[in-house]
């Protein structure tokens, strides 16, 4: 019997932006790199598969997590036209050596692209990046040579930077943090937008200032804004809080919403959406706990600006309308709060397929939300995703149910 079964609530068009996938055959990275912490798959005779980490069972998954034909059958049964596929966060491997994380990321992305090409009108890939070394992350798109981009008329072609996107990747899933670094950390700025040529300013202090004084730029086009690439932020590596989350499935029920709220607050109060207003950040699980604590965060920003408003002079509640989230909140009242936080124009359907904590009746909360008009439902079920991902809807929806 399946761990969980996804079903349909209607025949409405649907684009699910939050669906996970694993490669069917994962190399033994522990053996390859010579240290533990990596996941491998152990396929069992009963049809289940064990995700194994350091010799211990991490999670049981079924073929719909790695077999594309099984996935498509589930999508047909649940009347899902399109899924946006992203890896399971345990595959991020941000804790590993950066060169090794890059190898894992490239393997995951190559497998993801290959599987999506089997059903290009049904599956949209969202890749992964070695976020523990953002320079490597940028080079996943294509190498950029910061030094020559300052003055060379024959600077590197943007087409090379667009290599990965031209292969079909519409965005990247990133973790809610990387070790001690939240998403406002300056190390991530090269991935966000027009950022200072940090390589030069680090190697040769004052060099960039010298050129800028002469009216020459040391700024490089930012990858994600330039290419209209979405960063899908997923909570991961939830802290165990001295063991208090060890039982009752607390890391997933409490840890994940808290982790996502912390990531959103870092982005808002870290000035990221002021510096990079075109950046598309979509947060999983309806933004986690952020809609519930939004008023508290804004109040704290007002009464303790010395602690909260150091980098950003714009109140958080004036910026959260720039955020995107998925719709995975499980409750109509929670959806209403989310709408009042980010706006119904910035919410996209998400299920967390194929895991049991997802929305098993796909689109149920959206379709049963009584204040919605037919247009509102259509927007949340698929049209907002088309806008966020910047995809041609004419290339999709070749499957009628």
Curated annotation (Swiss-Prot):
Chain positions recorded as Zn(2+) binding sites: 18, 20, 234, 352
GO cellular component: cytoplasm; cytosol
Keywords, alphabetical: Decarboxylase, Lyase, Metal-binding, Zinc
EC number of the protein: 4.1.1.45
Listed pathway(s): Secondary metabolite metabolism; quinolate metabolism
GO biological process terms held by the UniProt record: negative regulation of quinolinate biosynthetic process; secondary metabolic process
Residues where substrate binds: 59
Alphabetized Pfam families for the sequence: Amidohydro_2 (PF04909)
Catalyzed reactions per annotation: 2-amino-3-carboxymuconate 6-semialdehyde + H(+) = 2-aminomuconate 6-semialdehyde + CO2
Summary of the function given for this chain in its UniProt record: Converts alpha-amino-beta-carboxymuconate-epsilon-semialdehyde (ACMS) to alpha-aminomuconate semialdehyde (AMS).
Quaternary structure note: Monomer.
Similarity comment text for this entry: Belongs to the metallo-dependent hydrolases superfamily. ACMSD family.
Listed name of the protein: 2-amino-3-carboxymuconate-6-semialdehyde decarboxylase
GN (gene name): acsd-1
